[in-house]
Design a protein with these regions (language model features):
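Low-complexity, intrinsically disordered terminal/linker segments enriched in charged
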Residues: 138-160
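A short, structured loop/turn motif at beta-sheet edges
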Residues: 91-98, 131-137
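Bacterial N-terminal signal peptides
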Residues: 5-15
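Short, low-complexity N-terminal intrinsically disordered segments enriched in polar/charged residues
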Residues: 16-50, 54, 156-160
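Solvent-exposed loop/turn segments at secondary-structure junctions
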Residues: 63-65, 104-107, 144-148
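Exposed beta-sheet edge and beta->alpha loop/turn motif
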Residues: 106-134
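A solvent-exposed, acidic/Ser-Thr-rich amphipathic alpha-helical stretch
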Residues: 45-97, 103
Length: 160
């Protein structure tokens, strides 16, 4: 009977996966929040790499992007929307993942993303899922509605 109890305890530990300490969850959430609030919202792009692993990969739209490519995309975004604001609406952590529901807004006053400046404002909601390793963001998946962005900027064909 004792062996059965030990076996059941071991099986439960294996099935439930790795246990992540509450302080690790809180620390990962804080890194994610700081990335959104300090780097993206306040435009401190020079601090971008402080929260990311050197071999970070972004799996968002299109092909996977390296840290350098993701940082270049953020610079291009900030160029196109220099007054961009980013707000963290909700943040959840489980295991080695942190999910952030966010809102971004800004005015398109300069060319960027291969599009002309429109002078129009844009607002959008999105979700980003981060995977952490050793306290740094290792991977990222972001989703948002690009159609809505193009529509708000007046860059979609109108019905004729």
């Amino acid at each position: 009977m004792r062996h059965l109890a030990l076996f059941m305890l071991a099986a439960t530990a294996i099935i439930s996966g790795p246990v992540v300490a509450k302080d690790t969850l809180a620390r990962n959430k804080e890194v994610a929040r700081s990335f959104f609030e300090d780097v993206l919202d306040k435009g401190k792009l020079e601090d971008y790499a402080k929260s990311h692993a050197p071999d970070f990969i972004a799996h968002s739209e299109g092909q996977p992007a390296s840290l350098e490519e993701d940082m270049a995309a953020a610079r291009e975004q900030r160029k196109a929307l220099p007054d961009m604001r980013v707000k963290v609406n909700h943040i959840v952590a489980e295991g080695d993942h942190v999910s952030v529901y966010w809102t971004a807004s800004g005015t398109n006053t300069a060319a960027g993303w291969g599009m002309p400046a429109t002078g129009k404002s844009v607002s959008l909601n999105g979700m980003t899922l981060f995977r952490f390793e050793r306290g740094l963001i290792q991977e990222e998946w972001s989703v948002f509605n690009m159609y809505s962005i193009l529509k708000q900027l007046g860059l979609l064909p109108t019905k004729g």
